[in-house]
Amino acid sequence: MQLRLGEPPLTQAECALVYCFAPSGENATFSLPAEIASLDEKVWSGLVAEAAQEQKFQGKPNSSLALRLPGPIRKLVLVGLGDPAALTLEALRRATANGLRQAHSLKAKQVVLSLPDTGLDQVRAVQAVAEASLLVAHQDNRFKSPPKPEEERGFSVEEVTLLVPGLAQARQDYENALQRATEMAAGTILARELVAAPANVVTPPALAETARQLAQDYGLEVEILGREECQALGMGAFLGVAQASDLPPQFIHLTYKPKEGDPVAKLALVGKGLTFDSGGLNIKTDSRSIAMMKTDMGGAAAVLGAARALAALKPQVEVHFIVAATENMISGRALHPGDILTASNGKTIEVNNTDAEGRLTLADALVFAEKLGVDAIVDLATLTGACVIALGEEIAGLFTPDEKLAQELQQAANLSGEKIWRLPLEESYFEGLSSTVADMKNTGPRSGGSITAALFLKQFVEKTPWAHLDIAGPVWAEKDSGYTNKGATGYGVRTLVEWVLAREMAAASS
């Protein structure tokens, strides 16, 4: 999809997408935006107002009205924004996606989008609209047969022009917003396609090859450690999980460094990279659950997607992207329940459940990240079903002992529209991981499972500010919603990018 900028007025278009606010105040009635009301009176003889009244369109959130009309605008989509005082960037994204889905239903190819005065930061609003446009248009047909000549496939909208009041006065700011949106969307789409691909396509070596390609395309440093190199570093927890698979484990370390000048911050992003999780000898017995275990590398996908976006945006921040990639399989070499592993920080772990393997791989990845001397570490993992039970399928759980980092990530999530909710690191719960034969077990009691999982990870970070995002819920969507299509969501990419960019901005202003 092509994105362009333009200035009002809206005079001619194949398809126009117009935002409408709901009436506010007692006894207030809905009225069309002025530019559409004028065209309706002069050109359309009141057809739009009549249709809005008949369809009871009132500009409410999640509402829309799609019409075919005589020129100069042949297709018109009205989308509701609701109460202007309650408008958020995420509501604007969702309304944009809703409108573009309607434009698709009208088979529109070129859409002109008239951005009103939203009361929000207008540059941020342009970025939000552009993100939604690019993400809703993404359709993953890689594994389908080519369409027949008469078969329509893909999103019809090919070009979106954003009409922005006052464009000339701040054109470069708006162009920068489009670039940020474009790169964030590209990173999100990379993450979506990694998660959506089956485990016979996205293997540990395939993830490593993706990292190598990113390094080649964007000038990143890349280090891929195999089994022997990981053994030399004492990564017994990671390798214990990997030992049953016929595919080699791959420890991926990508680094972005600014081309000129010293970095203003040094950060690490760590992603869980289980390309398939059978559960090991504690095998997953639910067929639906095991079929979805191709998604267990959603954290790795988010980290690689963020690498793609940040390498293109070029912040003055050094960022390390770390993934311990493997499968969790069953074979004669498989990890047994009761086995004891030694992580690279010397701590020993009694494995009382081989299906709690992600935290074992993350343990060595977190130790590796801290040794880099970074200012902060954020890990993302499809870690626990308990977090999905607690927060549902749209919200990630945030765990951190660091108040500043918690606030930073919440602010980044507010900007991206990716929902997070902070959960407690209740230290007394760590008693549930106590072992009589090792320093700790890898799982505790059923209750508080997402908390004990986070407390387990905490044992592998000594002093560096650290946060853990449990993304087991939002990594996958069971239906179209807003700018997210059914399937892999690419969750986490935009929040990570916003966090890194905010760190850069904070350093520049201090």
From Swiss-Prot:
Required cofactor names: Mn(2+)
Enzyme Commission number(s) from the entry: 3.4.11.1, 3.4.11.10
Reactions accelerated catalytically: Release of an N-terminal amino acid, Xaa-|-Yaa-, in which Xaa is preferably Leu, but may be other amino acids including Pro although not Arg or Lys, and Yaa may be Pro. Amino acid amides and methyl esters are also readily hydrolyzed, but rates on arylamides are exceedingly low; Release of an N-terminal amino acid, preferentially leucine, but not glutamic or aspartic acids
Chief location of this protein within or outside the cell: cytoplasm
Binding site for Mn(2+) 1: 277, 355, 357
Alphabetized Gene3D superfamilies for the sequence: Leucine Aminopeptidase, subunit E, domain 1 (3.40.220.10), Zn peptidases (3.40.630.10)
InterPro entries: Leucine_aapep/pepB, Macro_dom-like, Peptidase_M17_C, Peptidase_M17_leu_NH2_pept, Peptidase_M17_N
Manganese is among the record's keywords: yes
Gene Ontology CC: cytoplasm
Cofactor descriptive note: Binds 2 manganese ions per subunit.
Keyword Protease included in the entry's annotation: yes
UniProt-annotated location(s): Cytoplasm
Annotated family: Belongs to the peptidase M17 family.
NCBIfam families: PRK00913.1-2 (NF002073), PRK00913.1-4 (NF002074), PRK00913.2-3 (NF002076), PRK00913.3-5 (NF002083)
Protein name: Probable cytosol aminopeptidase
Gene this chain is encoded by: pepA
